[in-house]
Amino acid sequence: MGESMTWVQALVLGLVQGLTEFLPISSSAHLRIVSSVFFGEDAGASFTAVTQLGTEAAVLVYFAKDIWRILVAWTTTLWDKARAATGPRVPIHDRPTTRLPVLTADNEHRFAAEAQRELDYRIGWYVIIATIPIGVLGFLFKDEIRTGARNLWLVSFMLIAFALVIAAAEHYGAKRRPIEQLTTRDGLVMGFAQCLALIPGVSRSGATSSAGLFLGLEREAAVRFSFLLAIPAVTASGLFSLPDAFEPAGEGLNASGPQLLVATIVSFVVGYASVAWLLKFVARHSLNWFVGYRIVLGLVIMGLLGAGVISAT
């Protein structure tokens, strides 16, 4: 059996989760590194998954209006399409003659609202479609994700390797397409990119945002869709990991129920501030600011591993 987690450790790890979840530096890698370097034990994949519920709750609150609008547009448009498909057919010669509407302020507002509704409907589908790959792979490789994928040699390597991917995306990405031009192909590519985040050190936001940049999306559009895309996957992962987190077994730090709750609340509060800051940051700055940090951190961890200061497992 592992050691019991202290309240200080729970607070620190909740803070780390909130600070790093939305930055392209991998929150799972930071929880793995901080718990091992400073506390001598791995907090575990289940602890990571459950505290991510706090940061995803922050996304739900921050994007509440967007999410509600997408849900309403998706359900109502789907219902309208279903009714139109099953309704009575009107012969062409019996259909009323349509006239081009007179362009007025009211019409412009209505057209804009319809365009927004169509976009929200499409984004709803894109999130659903893009979530399928990580759902399948996460289920098939759940044991490997909780064990071998948390090896610090692999984590440090992925921190460095994906730093280069992010830098390449910033350099070669056209960054011309707004979120209104998002397509099914974009959603699928970003969905498969999200699967890479199953490996600590990659970063969910880093993987999906980089994919969006390679596809030519504007940086802010790529990051915004990245946040929306993470909601179903991270929420499902956290709920799936709840039983293991509350009944820990084996090596590592074991958190109690109250400690998990406090860590999750801390991650929510800090995560909300983090997502608000990042969206403002990417509107004016590139993701290259995080590249150097990832490389330095990866090299430091490799150095500590090579010197025998910390254990890889």
UniProtKB/Swiss-Prot annotation:
It comes from Nocardia farcinica (strain IFM 10152). Keywords: Antibiotic resistance, Cell membrane, Cell shape, Cell wall biogenesis/degradation, Hydrolase, Membrane, Peptidoglycan synthesis, Transmembrane, Transmembrane helix. InterPro entries: UppP. This is Undecaprenyl-diphosphatase. It is a multi-pass membrane protein. Its EC number is 3.6.1.27. GO terms for cellular component: plasma membrane. Catalyzes the dephosphorylation of undecaprenyl diphosphate (UPP). Confers resistance to bacitracin. It is found in: Cell membrane. NCBIfam families: PRK00281.2-1. It holds the Pfam family BacA. It comes from the Bacteria. Bacitracin is thought to be involved in the inhibition of peptidoglycan synthesis by sequestering undecaprenyl diphosphate, thereby reducing the pool of lipid carrier available.
